Curated annotation (Swiss-Prot):
GTPase-activating protein (GAP) for ADP ribosylation factor (ARF). SUPFAM superfamilies: ArfGap/RecO-like zinc finger. The keyword Cell membrane does not apply. A zinc finger (C4-type) spans 25-48. Residues 10-128 form the Arf-GAP domain. Residues 133-153, 225-234 have a biased composition (Polar residues). Residues 204-216 have a biased composition (Basic and acidic residues). This is Probable ADP-ribosylation factor GTPase-activating protein AGD9. Pfam families: ArfGap. The gene is AGD9. The modification N-acetylalanine is found at residue 2. The modification Phosphoserine is found at residue 307. InterPro entries: ARFGAP/RecO, ArfGAP_dom, ArfGAP_dom_sf. Keywords: Acetylation, GTPase activation, Metal-binding, Phosphoprotein, Zinc, Zinc-finger.
C-alpha cells in the first residue's frame, strides 16, 4: 500500500501541498502554485514556470501538477525536495529570494542541489527494487514447503531413489530393447488386391523391349472432299515423323508418304518441303515455258533498240497512236492552215497567260511609280492647303491685334 501511495500523483501532491512552504511559489511567493520544477523539487506559479521553460530542459524541467503525468522517479524527486529544503540550500550558498532567475538556476549552487537530489532519488529507487525481490523470495519458499509437505532436500532424495530404481533393473530394459528389435518389419497383408497395391510382373520388360516389332503406320484413306486440306488434315494423325505430298495428275488426287530423310526433288524451296500441293504442276510447267518463249521473243525484237517502253513491250502503242492520229485527221481535214495552239488545244485567251519574270517585274515597278507619284501629288496638295490655312489664321490674328 505504501508503494501505491508513492506512485499516485494526487496523493503525493496532496501531502506536499499541505505544508505551508509549498503553498506559495518558490521564486515570486505567489499563492496556490500549480506547476513544479522536477530537477529541483520546487513549486512554481504559471509565470515563473514560463521563465523556467525558457531556460531549457537541461537546466529546469517544468511540469503541471494537475494536467501532466508523472513517473515514480519524478514524484520521488518532489518528495525529497520541496520549497523549504531548496530555500535553505540556496541561502547557505549565498542566494536570497531576490535576484534574477536565470543567474540563480545557472549558478554552481543550483547545479550542486540538482545533483544531490538526483543521487538521493537513484539510491532510493535502487533500494525499492532490491527489497521487494527479497521479500517475494522469502514468502515463496514456505508456501512451497507447506504445499508439498517436504523440505527442500526431499526432491534430492526422491531423485536418488529414482536413479537407484533405474540402475537396479538393467536386465528388464535390455529385454525390452531386444524384443523390439526382434520384431520383423513386414507389411500387413490386406484382403483386397486392387487400388494402389503392387502386382508381380509376368514378363521382363528389358528382354522384350528389343524383340517388339515397330508399330505399323495407319493406312491413309483418301478423303472424299474436293479440297486437299481435309485430306491432309485427316492423314496428319498417322505419324509424327511423316509428311504427305499431294499430287494432281489427270484430274485425280492422291497422297504419297515420304520418308523423313527423303532427298530433295528440286531446287525449289516449297517443293522440297511438300508445299507444292496448292499449285498444280502442269500449269506451272506450261507457264514457265511460256515465260521462256516470251523472253526469247522480246530479246530478239528489242536487241538493237536503245530504249524500250512498256507500251512497246506489251504491244499497246500502235492502238493508242492510231486512235490519236485518226482524231487529229478528222479534226483538221477541211482546214487550210493549222497553228500550234489549234494542234495542242490552246485557246486565243491563253496567249496572255505566258508572262516572263522580267515582264512581271516591269509591270510591278510601273505600278509602284504611279502610286508614288500620286502620293507625292497628294502630299503637295495637303502642304499647300495647310500653308494657305496657316497664313489666313496669321493674318486674322494680326488684324485683331491692330
Amino acid at each position: 500500500m505504501a508503494t501505491e501511495n508513492l506512485t499516485d500523483k494526487n496523493v503525493v501532491f496532496r501531502k506536499l501541498k499541505s505544508k505551508s512552504e509549498n503553498k506559495v511559489c518558490f521564486d515570486c511567493s505567489a499563492k496556490n502554485p500549480t506547476w513544479a520544477s522536477v530537477p529541483y523539487g520546487i513549486f512554481l506559479c504559471i509565470d515563473c514556470s514560463a521563465v523556467h521553460r525558457s531556460l531549457g530542459v537541461h537546466i529546469s524541467f517544468v511540469r503541471s501538477t494537475n494536467l501532466d503525468s508523472w513517473s515514480p522517479e519524478q514524484l520521488r524527486t518532489m518528495m525529497f525536495g520541496g520549497n523549504n529544503r531548496a530555500q535553505v540550500f540556496f541561502k547557505q550558498h549565498g542566494w536570497n529570494d531576490g535576484g534574477k532567475i536565470e543567474a540563480k538556476y545557472t549558478s554552481r549552487a543550483a547545479d550542486m542541489y540538482r545533483q544531490t537530489l538526483a543521487k538521493e532519488v537513484a539510491k532510493a529507487m535502487a533500494e525499492e527494487t532490491v527489497l521487494p525481490s527479497l521479500s517475494s523470495v522469502a514468502t515463496s519458499q514456505p508456501v512451497e514447503s507447506s504445499e508439498n509437505g517436504f523440505t527442500s532436500e526431499s526432491p534430492k532424495e526422491s531423485s536418488l531413489k529414482q536413479e537407484a530404481a533405474v540402475v537396479s533393473s538393467p536386465k528388464a530394459s535390455q529385454k525390452v530393447v531386444a524384443s523390439t528389435f526382434k520384431k520383423p518389419l513386414v507389411s500387413r497383408k490386406s484382403g483386397k488386391t486392387g487400388g494402389l497395391g503392387a502386382r508381380k510382373l509376368t514378363t521382363k520388360s528389358k528382354d522384350n523391349l528389343y524383340e517388339q516389332k515397330p508399330e505399323e503406320p495407319v493406312p491413309v484413306i483418301p478423303a472424299a472432299s474436293p479440297t486437299n486440306d481435309t485430306s491432309a488434315a485427316g492423314s496428319s494423325f498417322a505419324s509424327r515423323f511423316e509428311y504427305f505430298d499431294d499430287e494432281q495428275s489427270g484430274g485425280q488426287s492422291g497422297t504419297r508418304v515420304l520418308s523423313h530423310v527423303a532427298p530433295p526433288k528440286s531446287s525449289n524451296f516449297f517443293n522440297e518441303f511438300g508445299m507444292d500441293s496448292a499449285f498444280p504442276k502442269k500449269s506451272s510447267s506450261s507457264s514457265s515455258k511460256a515465260q521462256v518463249e516470251e523472253t526469247d521473243e522480246a530479246r530478239k525484237k528489242f536487241s538493237n533498240a536503245k530504249s524500250i517502253s512498256s507500251a512497246q513491250f506489251f504491244g499497246n502503242q500502235n492502238r493508242d497512236a492510231d486512235l490519236d492520229s485518226k482524231a487529229t485527221l478528222q479534226k483538221f481535214s477541211g482546214s487550210a492552215a493549222i497553228s500550234s495552239s489549234d494542234l495542242f488545244g490552246h485557246g486565243p485567251d491563253d496567249s496572255n497567260i505566258d508572262i516572263t519574270a522580267s515582264d512581271l517585274i516591269n509591270r510591278i515597278s510601273f505600278q509602284a511609280q504611279q502610286d508614288m507619284s500620286s502620293i507625292a501629288n497628294l502630299a503637295e496638295e495637303t502642304k499647300n492647303k495647310l500653308g494657305t490655312f496657316a497664313s489666313s489664321i496669321f493674318s486674322d490674328l494680326q488684324d485683331r491685334m491692330l
